[in-house]
């Protein structure tokens, strides 16, 4: 019988992610791993976590389902859309570079470190797989559905009932607030 594994809110903690992955069995081609967002921020290895996810997607392309969370959306808005942010993702940014590289970037543009680091991520060849992954995932739907389950980072519009797919705002899928728990819907 196929198994579904789900992991959420890794937040840049690679060791903990690897520990959780050690309990996931993808040797059975029918098993699935659903990653439910917030892979970055807080921990010191956000870039390494995403790199591991990209590797898993390549190795198990039909078994890995990857959904974005609000932290990836915020990072996309900052990096790709160049929207201003209040946090500038310090731990996530540090995970892309060595201390020497960060020092060089700071010295190259001391008046606007945020722009300099954004440009370095966007223009450095070693980050192309990450950029492509982020752009592709940003276009993907924010939920995964089985016959009996809905996987989503934050929530759905519970009042919409069977019309939740059509009536849930994209914001609610990844950033639902306040947190609520509702009935279990079986369609």
Give the label of every model feature segment.
Residues 1-187:
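Feature recognizes metal-dependent phosphohydrolase scaffolds
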């Amino acid at each position: 019988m196929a198994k579904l594994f789900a992991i959420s809110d890794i937040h840049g903690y690679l060791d903990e992610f690897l520990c959780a992955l050690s309990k996931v069995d993808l040797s059975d081609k029918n098993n699935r791993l659903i990653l439910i967002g917030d892979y970055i921020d807080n921990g010191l290895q956000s870039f390494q976590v995403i790199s591991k996810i990209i590797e898993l997607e390549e190795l198990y392309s039909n078994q890995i389902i990857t959904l974005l969370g609000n932290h990836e959306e915020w990072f996309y808005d900052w990096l790709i859309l160049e929207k201003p942010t209040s946090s500038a993702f310090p731990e996530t940014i540090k995970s892309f570079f060595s201390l020497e590289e960060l020092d060089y970037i700071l010295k190259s543009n001391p008046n606007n470190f945020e722009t300099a680091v954004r440009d370095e991520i966007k223009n450095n060849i070693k980050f192309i797989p990450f950029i492509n992954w982020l752009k592709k995932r940003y276009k993907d739907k924010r939920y995964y559905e089985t016959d009996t389950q809905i996987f989503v980072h934050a929530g759905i519009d519970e009042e919409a009932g069977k019309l939740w797919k059509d009536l849930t705002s994209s914001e609610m899928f990844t950033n639902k607030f306040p947190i609520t728990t509702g009935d279990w819907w079986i369609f």
